[in-house]
């Protein structure tokens, strides 16, 4: 049985532990209410700020048709779940808006439009829920991110594996001749894991794939510098 002193210590440790949230989102209080008659931006109080949860599609040419009709939802990296996540990118498996420190509303995991903000008159909600919730369930997102995280872990294992490290040492001893002659053979597993991730993403985005059928596209992590796992979604209206 746990005594009261131990319980107090456990509660203190829990309260001091930082809660995870999507650090890509931010709030904004000066915006135009949807359905307002004057259609002019006004200042809102703390409880009615917009949560900016989708962003310009930087993977499309600015001014292009795709840029105009799509937005990007960013799933953040997690650094707190394992030591390896500090070296190897590992992304949150939680649907944006369901994180422990997310801003929540009365509508649960539904993306509810509240107001317009930004030059392009983009529509946002007042909670951390993003438009991605309209296309993927929490379980579907978790499955996709688990697979991506697994590919990245295996790729990192090959990068720091004996083949690659031996090749680096031999490269130093031979003045680069090793890489020129036999390096590609030993580095092949690294490229195979990278190729496997690319193939998985291509499968999701191709006809018949989960994301393609939902009108969503996953961006390869390397294109964002592995700072976030980006999903291209239709622009909310």
Curated annotation (Swiss-Prot):
The keyword Cytoplasm does not apply. It is a peripheral membrane protein. Keywords: Endoplasmic reticulum, Membrane. Pfam families: Erf4 (PF10256). One of its GO terms (biological process) is protein targeting to membrane. It is found in: Endoplasmic reticulum membrane. The keyword Secreted does not apply. One of its GO terms (cellular component) is endoplasmic reticulum membrane. Belongs to the ERF4 family. Interacts with ERF2. Present with 937 molecules/cell in log phase SD medium. The ERF2-SHR5 complex is a palmitoyltransferase specific for Ras proteins. Palmitoylates RAS2, which is required for its proper plasma membrane localization. PANTHER family: GOLGI AUTOANTIGEN, GOLGIN SUBFAMILY A, 7, GOLGIN SUBFAMILY A MEMBER 7_ERF4 DOMAIN-CONTAINING PROTEIN. This is Ras modification protein ERF4. It comes from Saccharomyces cerevisiae (strain ATCC 204508 / S288c) (Baker's yeast).
